[in-house]
């Protein structure tokens, strides 16, 4: 996803003289405001035009992390400041001693003047902490709306306030912004995900139709079957006198025994759920393995080559806003799903312990519009960017799912995992 890509709609209603934060603490996502509209119903009888104002701290963008790399420079500056402070204190003591010699009255006046200066400095500092800016002024007699282009990140402490008689409504989008997360955070979250999240065999059977252990066993057995082929070449050279009829019989017996072994393995791998799930998520690794079995060997003398990459196939993963993790199992074709598009999907929803709490694998696909708030935030983010025919695993943390709300089959603060297949896009 590119920078500043819209991911959901943003709306905020402002009543006169009631400051409201631009970004809520429980949903720290960057926003882009594009329109300010006036509510024609006045909140009082004065009918005064309403002005939209921004209240922000001038130093809000400078977080503690900004200074971590400059610790050494700060220590040097602190030492210089301490020396300057000591010199100033010495000068002040000398001045006080000279003033005492001139009389007690003059010293009292100086102390009063210093206290007044300190109070004025404190007032100036308080005023400098918060800055106020007028964005636009709207009136039902002259102008109802004003187009804007304001981008605000969670690091900024920004409040909106309306002065006047009419409420103002703001419209825009939640966007993906580089300031929301660093690349180092993505890498750390990916490492934690690889270490902590482990699929149980039952879940793999639901998705792929066979446990992962069976796949590795099949590859090991195929390697073991490949070893006798090399030994057969040596034996054929040594046993030249063997009749062609006997050799044909032996080859036929070996082929029938191999077919019976494969039939038994296929029976073990068959899962009832995979038969019912005709349009649901499929396992690409299982399809590739079946294609390898169906391809006959043209020459027995060819030495089988081991491919370590096929044993442990890694799927591309991404960490999105709010900690949502996506893993593309199969890339679709055609246009990709964006905010405002209507999508139709098949899905299987599971808890972290592997328990299935919801699914749509047959009948009418589940349809909704992206970015319109028709589903949980993590689901909106997870489906965005998919193409028709694509399959994706989406892992949603509690804050991007149902949070502390408990639902039937879903405990509070649950991490949700969805295996999704996009079947339609409009």
Swiss-Prot record:
Composition bias type Acidic residues, residue spans: 65-94, 111-131, 181-225
Q: Does the keyword Ubl conjugation apply?
A: no
EC primary class: isomerase
Query: How does its activity get regulated?
Result: Inhibited by both FK506 and rapamycin.
Name the major location.
Answer: nucleus
According to the entry, every stretch annotated as the PPIase FKBP-type domain falls at 340-426
The places in or outside the cell where this protein is found are: Nucleus, Nucleolus
Annotated GO CC locations: chromatin; nucleolus
The EC number(s) attached to this protein equal 5.2.1.8
Q: Which reaction does it catalyse?
A: [protein]-peptidylproline (omega=180) = [protein]-peptidylproline (omega=0)
The alphabetized UniProt keywords are:
Isomerase, Nucleus, Rotamase
UniProt lists compositionally biased (Basic and acidic residues) regions at: 226-257, 264-278, 287-311
Entries under PANTHER family matching the protein? 39 KDA FK506-BINDING NUCLEAR PROTEIN, FKBP-TYPE PEPTIDYL-PROLYL CIS-TRANS ISOMERASE FKPA
The UniProt family comment states: Belongs to the FKBP-type PPIase family. FKBP3/4 subfamily.
Role, per record: PPIases accelerate the folding of proteins. It catalyzes the cis-trans isomerization of proline imidic peptide bonds in oligopeptides.
Name this polypeptide is given? FK506-binding protein 3
Q: Read off the lineage from the record.
A: Eukaryota, Fungi, Dikarya, Ascomycota, Saccharomycotina
């Amino acid at each position: 996803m590119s920078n500043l890509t819209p991911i959901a709609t943003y709306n905020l209603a402002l009543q006169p003289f009631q400051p409201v934060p631009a970004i809520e603490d429980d949903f720290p996502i960057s926003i882009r405001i594009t329109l300010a509209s006036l509510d024609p119903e006045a909140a009082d009888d004065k009918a005064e035009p309403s002005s939209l104002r921004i209240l922000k701290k001038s130093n809000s963008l400078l977080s503690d992390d900004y200074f971590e790399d400059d610790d050494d420079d700060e220590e040097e500056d602190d030492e210089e400041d301490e020396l300057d402070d000591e010199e100033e204190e010495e000068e002040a003591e000398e001045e006080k001693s000279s003033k005492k010699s001139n009389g007690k009255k003059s010293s009292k006046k100086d102390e009063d003047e210093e206290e007044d200066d300190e109070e004025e400095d404190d007032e100036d500092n308080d005023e400098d902490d918060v800055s106020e800016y007028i964005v636009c002024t709207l009136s039902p007699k002259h102008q109802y709306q004003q187009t804007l282009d304001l981008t605000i990140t969670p690091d900024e402490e920004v409040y909106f306030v309306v002065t006047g008689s009419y409420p103002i409504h703001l419209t825009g989008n939640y966007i993906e912004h580089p300031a929301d997360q660093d690349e180092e955070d993505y890498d750390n979250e990916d490492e934690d995900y690889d270490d902590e999240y482990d699929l149980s065999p039952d879940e793999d059977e639901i998705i792929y139709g066979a446990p992962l252990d069976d796949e590795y066993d099949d590859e090991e057995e195929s390697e073991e079957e490949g070893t006798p082929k090399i030994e057969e070449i040596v034996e054929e050279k040594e046993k030249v006198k063997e009749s062609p009829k006997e050799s044909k019989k032996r080859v036929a017996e070996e082929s029938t025994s191999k077919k019976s072994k494969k039939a038994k393995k296929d029976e073990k791998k068959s899962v009832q759920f995979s038969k019912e799930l005709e349009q649901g998520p499929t396992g690409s690794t299982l399809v590739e393995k079946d294609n390898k079995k169906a391809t006959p060997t043209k020459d027995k003398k060819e030495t089988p080559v081991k491919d370590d990459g096929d044993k442990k196939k890694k799927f591309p993963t991404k960490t999105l806003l709010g900690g949502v993790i996506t893993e593309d199992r199969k890339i679709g074709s055609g246009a990709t799903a964006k905010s405002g598009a209507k999508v139709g999907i098949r899905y299987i929803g599971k808890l972290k312990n592997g328990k299935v709490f919801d699914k749509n694998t047959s009948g009418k696909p589940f349809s909704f519009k992206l970015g319109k708030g028709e589903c949980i935030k993590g689901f909106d983010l997870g489906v965005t960017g998919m193409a028709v025919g694509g399959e994706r695993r989406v892992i949603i943390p509690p804050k991007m799912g149902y949070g502390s709300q408990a639902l039937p089959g879903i405990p509070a603060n649950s991490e949700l995992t969805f295996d999704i297949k996009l079947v339609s896009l409009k």
